[in-house]
Amino acid sequence: MSAIDKLVKASHLIDMNDIIREGNPTLRKVAEEVTFPLSEKEEILGEKMMQFLKHSQDPIMAEKLGLRGGVGLAAPQLDISKRIIAVLVPNVEDAQGNPPKEAYSLQEVMYNPKVVSHSVQDAALSDGEGCLSVDREVPGYVVRHARVTIEYFDKTGEKHRLKLKGYNSIVVQHEIDHIDGIMFYDRINEKNPFAVKEGLLILE
């Protein structure tokens, strides 16, 4: 049974055992574009990927399924070399502890996403990045574009253009890297992991 056949079964919930780890060659391949109309399996896969992210952010489901929390997942991490990503970035409480009006700042399954333009300025998360396919900490600034404009297709084949900045920009770039065979630590300065070039925006 292929990876996608297993994952799209109605009874299957994606868990950490389905996620391949660094060293697996699929993570270093440039994934193939999907064509439209999508196959039923490709559509269900996108839904399952989003379901995994929701489960990973739900304390009860995460404990039950043994999940690490995640805000993004790419099909190659499931050993499926297709250009499909899911992103789910929760909003946080305000300074007074009030819940956000919208639960998520970004919630989307993207097919064939690509960066079409970006800022000159670079940015990095102050705490570095992690990855569901990497079971170790890799300290250092992961240097990315501070702002990007992306294009992607939804499951119906409709094309979207989105401008992103801040954390959402970082998350989407991390996932697009996965479909291009790039790992986050490829973008860390090997000799000086916390090197700060002039103009680098550090995001807290």
UniProtKB/Swiss-Prot annotation:
UniProt keywords, alphabetically: Hydrolase, Iron, Metal-binding, Protein biosynthesis
HAMAP family reported in the protein's UniProt record: Pep_deformylase
Cofactor: Fe(2+)
GO MF term set: metal ion binding; peptide deformylase activity
Note on cofactor: Binds 1 Fe(2+) ion.
Catalytic reaction equation(s): N-terminal N-formyl-L-methionyl-[peptide] + H2O = N-terminal L-methionyl-[peptide] + formate
UniProt lineage: Bacteria, Bacillati, Bacillota, Bacilli, Lactobacillales
Job description of the protein: Removes the formyl group from the N-terminal Met of newly synthesized proteins. Requires at least a dipeptide for an efficient rate of reaction. N-terminal L-methionine is a prerequisite for activity but the enzyme has broad specificity at other positions.
Keyword Protein biosynthesis among record annotations: yes
Gene: def
Originating species: Streptococcus agalactiae serotype III (strain NEM316)
Active site as annotated: E175
EC number annotated for this UniProt entry: 3.5.1.88
InterPro entries xrefs: Peptide_deformylase (IPR023635), Peptide_deformylase_sf (IPR036821)
Record keyword Manganese present: no
Residues binding Fe cation, per UniProt: C131, H174, H178
Matching Pfam families: Pep_deformylase
Protein name: Peptide deformylase
PANTHER family according to UniProt: PEPTIDE DEFORMYLASE (PTHR10458), PEPTIDE DEFORMYLASE 2 (PTHR10458:SF8)
